[in-house]
UniProtKB/Swiss-Prot annotation:
E.C. number: 6.1.1.2
Annotated positions binding L-tryptophan: 135
Keywords: Aminoacyl-tRNA synthetase, ATP-binding, Cytoplasm, Ligase, Nucleotide-binding, Protein biosynthesis
Organism: Synechocystis sp. (strain ATCC 27184 / PCC 6803 / Kazusa)
Record motif 'HIGH' region, residues: 12-20
Complex and partners: Homodimer.
Gene that encodes it: trpS
Name of protein: Tryptophan--tRNA ligase
Short motif ('KMSKS' region): ranges: 199-203
Length: 337
């Protein structure tokens, strides 16, 4: 029996941080043997907002190398670059032509980012969810790992599938597969070190708001030392008046691979002066093997290029099958080759 297929990806917009790792990538690694996995570096998504063309290519390689360093296993998973598979752009256009504009205008993430960009907001940012839908649908994904902030985009993908299948498919022969969300509640939202009510993000202007996977020990120590806390003694979870306390305890729980109950007992009587060195030591120990593996991978650039090339080829072969099916359903003349 074929394994269910998963599709997910990360933008190459700077270093990955603990939010990316604990909220997504680590769960991919833990579950990968149960699925047929396609993990993408979504560089086309990265240019929907202002980006640095001088660093995009290197950032793309960094994300691919970090996938491997974090434990993505090529026995179970395919790693590829989104822009290297032309079918993503073509399917996105075909989906655009059947997706109502008002579906996109109600997307919460677009509204939030459009406010920041003002008149300079791009059509690409508005259309981001349709490209995401193309990413998912090209690979007939059964499951899509999503955080709470991406659930609306996956719901849009499902709406697009239903619309296309109703218009162009048959009940016994749908054009596109309807994907299901794969939501991991524990650690799904790792919050900022500077504000426990905001998600840890690469787009935050302050480097002190996040711990990057490639941060050296001294930088981790500095960031934990400066992270926002409160004056209370004793540490506990789930207090809405202490969001930073809950966030830092959650980080320690995930990085130390302990249960919430064990951490609650261990830290109940601690002050921040005792807890912060403990969190620092735990974060450094958790990231050391990832950083060592990353350095090993980058030391053999040729092998990394071969991995990406092989992944691109496999992804393209799979994607072309779906694209041909959609083109046929929409009535296009098949190319004579």
């Amino acid at each position: 029996m074929d394994k269910p297929r998963i599709l997910s990806g990360v933008q190459p917009t700077g270093n990955l941080h603990l939010g990316n790792y604990l909220g997504a990538i680590r769960s991919w690694v833990e579950q990968q043997q149960h699925y047929d996995n396609f993990f993408c570096v979504v560089d086309l998504h990265a240019i929907t907002v202002p980006h640095n063309p001088q660093t995009l290519a290197q950032d793309t390689l960094t994300i691919a190398a970090l996938y491997l360093a974090c434990g993505i296993d090529l026995q179970y998973s395919t790693i590829f670059v989104q822009s290297h598979v032309a079918a993503h752009s073509e399917l996105a256009w075909l989906l655009n032509c059947v997706t109502p504009l008002n579906w996109l205008e109600r997307m919460i993430q677009f509204k939030e980012k459009a406010v920041k960009q003002g008149e300079n907001v791009s059509v690409g940012l508005l259309d981001y969810p349709v490209l995401m839908a193309a990413d998912i649908l090209l690979y007939d994904a059964d499951k899509v790992p999503v955080g709470e902030d991406q659930k609306q985009h996956l719901e849009l993908t499902r709406d697009i599938v239903i619309r296309i299948n109703d218009k162009f498919g048959r009940e016994d022969a749908p054009v596109l597969k309807l994907p299901e969300p794969l939501i991991r509640k524990e650690g799904a939202r790792v919050m900022s070190l500077a504000d426990g009510t905001k998600k840890m993000s690469k787009s935050d202007e302050s480097e002190l708001s996040r711990i990057n996977l490639l941060d050296p020990p001294e930088m981790i120590k500095k960031k934990v030392k400066k992270c926002k806390t409160d004056p209370q003694r004793g540490l506990w979870f789930d207090d809405p008046e202490r969001p930073e306390c809950h966030n830092l305890l959650t980080l320690y729980t995930l990085l130390s691979n302990q249960t919430k109950e064990a951490v609650a007992q261990e830290c109940a009587e601690m002050g921040w002066g005792q807890f912060k060195p403990l969190l620092t030591e735990t974060a450094i120990a958790a990231l050391e093997p990832i950083q060592a593996k990353y350095a090993e991978i980058l030391a053999d650039r040729g092998e990394l290029d071969r991995i990406i090339q092989a992944g691109n080829a496999k992804a393209s072969q799979t994607a072309q099958q779906t694209l041909a099916r959609v083109r046929d359903a929409l009535g296009f003349l098949a190319p004579p080759y």
